Each structure stands twice: as structure tokens, then as C-alpha cells.
A protein has these predicted regions:
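Alpha/beta catalytic cores of nucleotide-metabolism and tRNA/nucleoside-modifying enzymes
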Residues: 1, 218-239, 243, 249-313
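N-terminal capping/small domains of soluble enzymes
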Residues: 1-99, 104-106, 282
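Alpha/beta enzyme core
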Residues: 32-37, 106-243, 251-262, 267
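Short gly/pro/ser/thr-enriched loop/turn and capping motifs at secondary-structure boundaries
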Residues: 48-53, 133-135, 198-201, 271-274
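Short low-complexity, flexible loop/linker segments enriched in glycine and/or proline
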Residues: 57-60, 141-143, 206-209, 279-283
Length: 313
């Protein structure tokens, strides 16, 4: 049987699958269930400085290409999130499943404080969300838009905590490699790529957007090629592990993401139809693919596309 164990920044994962932030990462019981269903690590929903109700309904819609959402970073605030994370960590520890805690902030100067509060729960890693695409009307241009602003946020978080940090980047920028280099230079231990892709759906019969917020973030199968390209590009310019997220719903999808250069593979929208059981399904399919193709472990696949990209078919 192929070995799925991953050493990620000194953190042991039983397999490379990660519950992506924003999907089921809202309560200890739900995150524990994901762990029991076979996820390698769980990421909590992003927490900010204070409670947010998010956008008005409708905020999400499943469609043939995946999911579009404009939930709007609904969260209880970092202080209220702290006991949730503490309880989650307590439940996950006996299962050998690490906890990644996601944070965001509306202002540069707030990131350090949110990180300090969340660090009290002792998560295994803090994921810094600087790239949510559907709150620009509230917070302005995302910090992920430029290398300078992304680096400034990373610097604030790095000064505030000693925990490993992963910065979550956006796909809709022209200089993704430059931004990746900038956050690593300021202390990012890893990079998460990608966040959802800005998009819009219209109800032609009603002649209006399907979301109350008008636009939202696309996820699911439709964005997998975008995510693969982003992970491939980032892995060529920085020497830190990448959590590749976007459009993963099968073992083949996971294998492709690892071949593009990802160390871990985030799973999100696939849970809309498959529920937490999707983690076991993907792991089984990944192992079967590796067995059939002669891969003994994940390292033998990681980044393989870089070595074969110019081969003649």
C-alpha cells in the first residue's frame, strides 16, 4: 500500500488532505467528524478582530461548475473563536490530526493582534487569509493584490507569533511569483494557494445576479486548472511547502496537485455533495492511483510535472 504520510514543517499528517478554511470548520464537533472520516489536517473558518454577520442571503449556490459564494467572512471574532479552537484541538489530538487556524483582519495593524489571540489556542499552524474576494466593498482591495501589502501583513504576523504561518494567496494577480517570494522573505513558512476566484452568476429569467452581494468567489472543479497553474508557478520560485487548494474532489485531482508541487491538498467544495466521507474516498482513490502507477510515497510524485513539462508526448 502506498504511503500517504506527510512531514509538513515538522508536523506529521497521516495523509495530505486538509479541510479547507470556510468549509465545515466552524465547530469542534464538525471538525472532529472530518478527522474521523480521514482528513489529514483541519483548517478552521477565518476569524477576525470582531464578530461579522457576513452578507445577506442568498450567499451561496451550487452550479454545474462548482460553487459560488459571497458569505462575507462570517465569524464570531477572534476572542470568541479562541475557546472553539481550544476545544477542537483537544478533540483532534487523540486522533493525531493537526489543527490549522485561519485568520484575517480588515486593517494591516490588526493582523498581529488577531494572530496573538488565536495563538493562545496553540494551533499547529496559522493560515493568514489575505485574499478573500468578496469583501472588497467592506475592506477595500485585498492585501494579496500586491507584493508590498502581502509582505507587510506577513511581517506583522511573523512579529506577533512563533508558530508556523502559511499565507493564503489569490489567483487573480499578474505577479503571483513575486508575491510568493515577498511573503516568504518576510517569514512565511508555507503558502496556501489558491483562494476562490472572483466571479458572477446571473439568473436570466429574473434578470439579476444569483447572489445578493452580486459577485462572489468561485470554487470547485471549474477552478482546478487555475489552482494547478498557481501551485506550479509558486513552487518554481520559492522553497517552502505549498497547500494546494482548488477543485479537488478525487484521488486523481489530488495526485495532479501534488505533481504540480503541492505538499498538502486542500478540499472544500467537494464536501457540498460528498460530505466528510469525501476524505476517505479521495485517500482510497489516491492510494489506488499510486499503486497502479508504481509510486511508493508522495515524495516520488511531488513536483514531477516540473521535470516532465517539456517532455515530448
Amino acid at each position: 500500500m502506498a504511503n500517504l504520510v506527510v512531514d509538513f514543517l515538522g508536523i506529521k499528517l497521516n495523509n495530505p488532505l486538509v479541510l479547507a478554511s470556510g468549509v465545515l470548520g466552524t465547530s469542534p464537533a464538525v471538525m472532529e467528524r472530518c478527522a474521523r472520516e480521514g482528513v489529514g489536517a483541519v483548517t478552521s473558518k477565518s476569524a477576525g478582530t470582531e464578530a461579522r454577520d457576513g452578507h445577506a442571503n442568498p450567499v451561496a449556490l451550487a452550479w454545474q461548475g462548482g460553487v459560488i459564494n459571497a458569505i462575507g467572512l462570517t465569524n464570531p471574532g477572534c476572542h470568541a473563536e479562541l475557546p472553539i479552537l481550544i476545544e477542537t484541538k483537544k478533540r483532534l489530538k487523540p486522533l493525531g490530526v493537526p489543527l490549522f487556524a485561519s485568520i484575517f483582519a480588515p486593517r494591516l495593524e490588526d493582523f498581529g493582534e488577531v494572530a496573538r489571540v488565536i495563538a493562545e489556542a496553540e494551533p499547529d499552524l496559522i493560515e493568514v487569509n489575505i485574499s478573500c474576494p468578496n469583501v472588497a466593498s467592506d475592506f477595500g482591495t485585498p492585501f494579496s493584490a500586491t507584493a508590498k501589502s502581502a509582505a507587510e501583513v506577513t511581517r506583522e504576523v511573523r512579529k506577533a507569533v512563533n508558530l508556523p504561518i502559511s499565507v493564503k494567496l489569490a489567483p487573480n494577480v499578474y505577479n503571483l511569483g513575486e508575491i510568493a517570494r515577498a511573503v516568504v522573505a518576510e517569514g512565511a513558512n508555507a503558502i496556501t494557494a489558491i483562494n476562490t476566484v472572483p466571479g458572477m452568476l446571473i439568473d436570466a429569467y429574473a434578470a439579476r445576479p444569483v447572489l445578493k452581494n452580486t459577485t462572489g468567489g468561485l470554487s470547485g472543479p471549474t477552478i482546478k486548472p487555475v489552482a494547478l497553474r498557481a501551485v506550479w508557478e509558486i513552487s518554481q520560485v520559492v522553497d517552502v511547502p505549498i497547500i494546494g487548494t482548488g477543485g479537488i474532489s478525487s484521488g486523481i485531482d489530488a495526485a495532479e496537485m501534488i505533481m504540480a508541487g503541492a505538499a498538502l491538498v486542500g478540499v472544500g467544495s467537494a464536501l457540498v455533495n460528498g460530505g466528510p466521507a469525501v476524505f476517505g474516498k479521495i485517500n482510497t482513490e489516491l492510494q489506488e492511483f499510486m499503486r497502479s502507477q508504481g509510486y511508493q510515497d508522495l515524495e516520488s510524485m511531488r513536483g514531477l510535472v516540473h521535470r516532465r513539462a517539456n517532455d515530448t508526448v
